[in-house]
Amino acid sequence: LIQLLIAAAAAAGLTVAHSDPRCAENPMLMGGWNREQAVVFLCAASIRAQGMDQEEILRHELIHVIQDLHQGALLPEPLFTILARETIPSGEVMMVIASGDDANRELECRLLTRMLSTHVVAQWLTESAAKNRQGVVIPVALVPKNP
């Protein structure tokens, strides 16, 4: 199913790369999203070394793209807080908060990565990108139905 995500990324005007210079700089980095170059990258060696799943990492990074297309949170409060408490282990929450990044954005992405199938993320990305290209204002706090 990783090919479905790659195809959805291409339809959205993105390139998926299996490496990036940042991967060598940070062996714990699994992937990232470069807005300026419209590139989502996977750190394939790190993913293998950590025993992670490339499809899950790509799904996570594409949810970050969807967050950017929607220019805001995808889940409304208090739903986000309730789901995060029920789904994400407290140690992981503390690690994200300590990282100094936008904690709510990252936690929302981790939550949705766990909750949404590859098919849903692919559909959501292609629909969001198409609406964005048409200049349609995309409502936030809207999760598509699972096909």
Task: List the predicted regions and their residue ranges.
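Long, contiguous secondary-structure blocks with strong helical propensity
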Residues: 1-13, 38-51, 62
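Metalloprotease/metallohydrolase-associated module, dominated by Zn2+-dependent proteases
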Residues: 1-5, 11-18, 22-30, 75-147
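Non-transmembrane alpha-helical segments in soluble domains
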Residues: 6, 55, 59, 63, ...
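Active-site scaffold of zinc-dependent metalloenzymes
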Residues: 21-55, 68-69
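Soluble non-cytosolic domains of exported or imported proteins
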Residues: 48-57, 99-107
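Catalytic Zn2+-binding segment of zinc metalloproteases
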Residues: 62-79
